[in-house]
Design a protein with these regions (language model features):
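Outer-membrane beta-barrel transmembrane domain signature
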Residues: 23-53, 64-65, 79, 94, ...
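Short, acidic/polar
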Residues: 55-58
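Selected alpha-helical membrane-embedding segments in polytopic membrane proteins
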Residues: 60, 64-69, 74-84
Length: 202
């Protein structure tokens, strides 16, 4: 199962169509001075840009800057309405997920996205999120989360406010590997998405 997730992520990154960088493993906080790497295949069902939806992928590297903050660098590719994209995310987990309480955090994200009409789009978003992990059978742990990314998108000298709702979960299969499943739905001038992926942490 894990090999299938990894192969799907690699193939979609090499031969991708339209996609949008999602929440993915932001709530799965990386410890101080540790790191994680993940592949995020994604289907985009609709966009407010010309070109419609498609299928693509993002690769993301996360590093634990402090005991309460992470830095993530992402790069992706696609066809349809969106092509190459690159950006970064700074996340602050101000209430850790511990026994008896949910985890709360916020992430600030900036991405440059090359569109297939030869123009470009720049996004600046905030990602408030809440998550809570719990054990299931055979030592596996689910870490479901809800996030509401919102912010500004700049394109061709204009800007607009955007907002999306996101529901997803990480599945901890062992100490190092996480599987990810996520759906996002348009609230205001954004995309509806479905993604799955895999990440590895040291």
């Amino acid at each position: 199962m894990i090999k299938a997730f990894f192969l799907l992520g690699l193939l979609s990154f090499l031969g991708a169509s339209s996609s949008q960088a999602g929440v993915f493993n932001i709530p799965e906080f990386v410890d101080y001075q540790s790191w994680a790497f993940g592949l995020e295949p994604e289907i985009t069902f609709d966009t407010f840009e010309k070109g419609g939806g498609g299928f693509g992928s993002n690769a993301k590297f996360t590093y634990g800057l402090t005991p309460l903050s992470n830095l993530q660098i992402g790069i992706g590719t696609g066809a349809g309405s969106r092509g190459f994209r690159v950006g970064g995310t700074y996340s602050f987990d101000f209430i850790p997920d511990m026994e008896g309480q949910v985890g709360l955090g916020v992430a600030a994200q900036g991405y440059y996205i090359k569109l297939h009409d030869a123009s470009a789009r720049t996004e600046g978003l905030l990602y408030p999120y809440v998550h809570k992990s719990f054990g299931i059978r055979n030592g596996m742990i689910l870490d479901p989360y809800v996030a509401v990314p919102f912010g500004m998108a700049f394109h061709s000298g204009t800007y607009r406010t955007v907002m999306q709702g996101v529901i997803g979960t990480a599945i901890r299969t062992n100490e190092h590997v996480r599987l990810h499943l996520e759906t996002g739905f348009n609230i205001k001038d954004y995309d509806s998405t479905l993604s799955l992926g895999i990440s590895y942490r040291d």
